[in-house]
């Protein structure tokens, strides 16, 4: 994580303030819903309005137009199962940005890639919903990890030949490293001085392994914090009934059964 003065102010897209942004521009043929050209650029933007997920974003005509465009694109460039709300729209655009950057970095033979290998021996039940099917594949996969170009593999869960994280440089170190690399390779910002020293230090094999270890620890803490946050904000949550899926039944040494439980509404186990 970056210091608060950077993450909440200087580097954050604050409403009404001018900010620099690394941008993927798409040129789309409306008749064929085809991406005919794309390019990466450094831009200066001014955020007119910061929207939140719990507001009626689709009431805004510009947001609605973007939503409909993404929904159509997903028919031909399918990165998510469906586009039903602005959550899905943002997820789609983030995956697309990450993938297009990964393709460029792959050609340049550099970058910090994100790989995820599926356990091909595991076959999920046929009767479960698509979301549960995907979760079970993820649960029984060999896990995702960051790796350099020499060791990178495909992202099987997204069904993409290459993938990087680059859309969240404020909250994830790998995204920041990839932005430094890609902007240097594109001639947008030169790599020198402290910038070069910082990148070289974090791209060492032992540093990448440290990133992988700390990311796993952070995810465990995040899950616990999310659960505590839910319970602290809603006193009635303990009285509600939620849909859940039980899996991975095992018999313990004391002859009792132990299960794993996944709750789709909270995306928690």
Regions found by a protein language model. Give the residues of each.
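Electropositive polyanion-binding surfaces
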Residues: 1-269
């Amino acid at each position: 994580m970056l210091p608060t003065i950077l993450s909440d102010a200087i580097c954050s897209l604050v409403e009404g303030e001018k900010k620099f942004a690394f941008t993927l521009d798409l040129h789309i043929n409306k008749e064929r819903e085809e991406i005919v050209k794309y390019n990466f650029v450094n831009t200066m933007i001014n955020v007119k309005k910061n929207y939140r997920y719990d507001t009626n974003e689709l009431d805004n005509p510009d947001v609605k137009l973007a939503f409909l465009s993404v929904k159509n694109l997903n028919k031909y460039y399918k990165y998510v199962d469906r586009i039903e709300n602005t959550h899905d729209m943002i997820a789609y655009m983030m995956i697309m940005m990450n993938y297009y950057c990964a393709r460029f970095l792959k050609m340049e033979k550099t970058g910090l890639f994100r790989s995820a290998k599926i356990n091909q021996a595991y076959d999920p039940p046929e009767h479960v919903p698509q979301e549960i099917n995907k979760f079970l594949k993820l649960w029984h996969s060999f896990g995702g990890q960051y790796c350099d170009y020499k060791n990178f593999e495909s992202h099987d869960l997204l069904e993409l030949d290459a993938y990087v994280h680059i859309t969240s440089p404020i909250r994830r170190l790998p995204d920041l490293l990839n932005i430094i690399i890609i902007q240097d390779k594109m001639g947008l910002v030169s790599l020198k001085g402290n910038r070069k020293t910082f990148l070289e230090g974090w791209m060492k094999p032992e540093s990448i392994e440290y990133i992988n270890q700390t990311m796993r620890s952070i995810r465990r803490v995040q899950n616990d914090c999310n659960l505590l946050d839910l319970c602290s904000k809603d006193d009635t949550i303990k009285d509600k009934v939620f849909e859940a899926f039980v899996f991975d039944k095992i018999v313990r040494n004391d002859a009792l059964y132990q299960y794993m439980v996944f709750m789709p509404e909270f995306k928690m186990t």
